[in-house]
Amino acid sequence: MTTTIRRKFRVSRQMKASLWGSQKDPVHKRNYAPGQHGRAPVKKISDFYKQNAAQRAFRTYYVIGKKQFANVFSKAYRGKGNTNDNLISLLESRVSSVLYRSGMVPTIFAARQLISHKHVTVNGEIVNICSFTLKEGDVVQIRDRASNIPCVVAALNSNSESPHYLEVDREKRSVKLLVLPKFEDVPYPVVMEPNLVTEYFSSKM
């Protein structure tokens, strides 16, 4: 977990923006790239660099490995309709994403931990795979035994808002996926560029 957090902060500094909107992100104090050359003048950035940075931002944001993310994109590319929207729908319909987006946990890392420890159900059945994909109408719920976990209690008592494609019931600790979102529906705290992700992978297909 510590390694993951260090990596996420590194990506935030490369983007010069807090990827999750966290006030604890060191980018707020060191708004330059990491490493000994972080303060050096910025050279002209190539298209490939921008594309690679875009796909890395998405991978880091959703905590997905390279191979798994490539598989997600491949599925989005083969699907009907707009590839960018397909990609976002697949990423946002993961159980870890829905739980995080509901506001019932403070971070996507907390969501993943609850899921892996079998504290979460989907339609009443325990799910311990973070990449489990939900369908419209599916209900995710935090189990009773996790109701007193400090980060869950704090999140449930907060006034955080959830996007319109989710229906949250804080008393029942549940969230329902009403509709698969498109890119413009998702409240990213930083600029995310799925079009560059499409360009990145399209050149490899």
From Swiss-Prot:
It comes from the Bacteria. Residues 93-171 form the S4 RNA-binding domain. GO terms for molecular function: rRNA binding; structural constituent of ribosome. Disulfide bonds: none annotated. One of its GO terms (cellular component) is small ribosomal subunit. SMART domains: Ribosomal_S4, S4. Pfam families: Ribosomal_S4, S4. One of the primary rRNA binding proteins, it binds directly to 16S rRNA where it nucleates assembly of the body of the 30S subunit. NCBIfam families: PRK05327.1, rpsD_bact. Part of the 30S ribosomal subunit. Contacts protein S5. The interaction surface between S4 and S5 is involved in control of translational fidelity. This is Small ribosomal subunit protein uS4. It comes from Neorickettsia sennetsu (strain ATCC VR-367 / Miyayama). The gene is rpsD.
